[in-house]
């Protein structure tokens, strides 16, 4: 079994630290501004581990960090350590869940607000060397014809090599996400990233956060143990049946 990282060892690509750090409006606004290239004034407190479920029968969704701006545009930001091979369809599902919870009965579809799903990953999902891949719906038959349905999905690659079309600040941010150190923050020459480092330091030295981290780890270990025990029990049943 892999050794548990201490809270001090976590990087921003680790979901626990990411959610704790980003559940702060000023921090999330700064990161969104670096990614999108414009200021995003949030209207309510950013939410970590926000759950959305339409019905008890539907698969629920837990957004790592969720926020809405003063124009009601929705932002879901995720970190993903491993390529699970389902990320394009997962982001489609996330986008759909945001839409389902946006309109009240009787409201017109034209009132559906824009929504962004942003995923940050330490691998190149599409193999093209880009730091940033942005997707919108468009027409196959007419190049350049956009659907303008308000849905945007962005995949950020910390291992990019092609800096065309992205800011140096975004490249430095992605580097900092993977190696969240004071040295990388200082070397970024970005006030926003240096401010982000201060937020990280506050979280890592917060006693209550440390307790939450240990509790989360213990719950995960318990789930794994229960899963192993269920697997062993099932294996014994199958063995008896075959015998």
What residue spans do the PLM features occupy?
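Elongated, amphipathic alpha-helical interaction scaffolds
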Residues: 1-242
